A protein has these predicted regions:
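Soluble, non-transmembrane alpha-helical interaction regions
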Residues: 36-37, 47-51, 59, 63-66
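Amphipathic alpha-helical coiled-coil segments
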Residues: 57-75, 87-88
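Long amphipathic alpha-helices with heptad-repeat character
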Residues: 21-24, 70, 77, 84
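N-terminal acidic leader/helix
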Residues: 4-42
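Amphipathic coiled-coil alpha-helices
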Residues: 27-28, 35, 51-52, 58, ...
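Short, charged, intrinsically disordered terminal tails
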Residues: 2-14, 75-93
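Short, charged, amphipathic alpha-helical segments
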Residues: 45-56, 71-78
């Protein structure tokens, strides 16, 4: 009997690496947009700088991951998706 409450160890097991890379890129783009929006809407210069630093760190992380390294791509997708969820849920209040 299969336990359906646990996600598969690799949700991308039957997905080509090129598609995983596309998901990686789209997730990074979504998170960059959220960070950029918060930077533009910041109440202070310090807060704006903090969000902009996150934009730059994300850019650097995105550039550092080789397009063929599935493990790193998937790890970043998962990490960034959690951050996106946290930011979006904080918007909803």
């Amino acid at each position: 009997m299969t336990n359906r409450t646990q996600p598969p160890a690799d949700p991308y097991q039957d997905v080509p690496t090129t598609v995983v890379f596309d998901e990686f890129s789209e997730t990074a783009t979504t998170l960059t947009g959220l960070y950029n929006s918060r930077s533009k809407g910041a109440a202070t210069a310090e807060e704006r700088e903090e969000w902009w630093d996150k934009v730059m760190a994300l850019r650097d992380a995105r550039r550092a991951v080789p397009a063929h390294d599935r493990d790193q791509l998937i790890a970043h997708i998962a990490r960034w998706a959690r951050v996106i969820e946290e930011l979006e849920s904080s918007e909803r209040g």
